[in-house]
Amino acid sequence: MTSGHAELQDRVPMSTTWFIAKEYLKRLEIDFEEHGRTTFSVHPEKHIETKVIEVFPGKNWITLTTRLMDLDELPPKGRKVVYEKLLKANATLVEVNFGIDKKNCLTLRNAAPVTGISYDVFNCTYEAHLAAIKFFFEKMKDQLLQE
């Protein structure tokens, strides 16, 4: 097997995953944009403060990621307390996790495994993501900014 063939073989499942993710997003009846065959930007409706949820269909996982806030907004003195609160939130909201990306933004992330993927699994992953966004903006953001 040539190297090029192996690369093509590695890309086929992701392409299939991309089509699956697109179909599930359509079934959710939500607005989204396609970015080539690599990602989707979902624009959640009603009562959600965030503007975009990025959906990354990969070979093994379909990952949802949202930037929640720029951590440069936080006072440097209170960051340790903020990080502790985020770790506790990770323990409370086991379906999702909070993290920090390369641009120093607080992110929310969760994923569904491609193996055994179904519309119900994808929908549960999406709903958990929305619930965590709501939790962050209703219960955490103001507290974090006060630290």
Short names for language-model regions:
Residues 51-72:
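A short acidic-to-branched-hydrophobic micro-motif
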Residues 65-105:
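Short, internal acidic amphipathic alpha-helical interface segments
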Residues 87, 91, 130-141:
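Short amphipathic alpha-helical signal-transduction/dimerization elements
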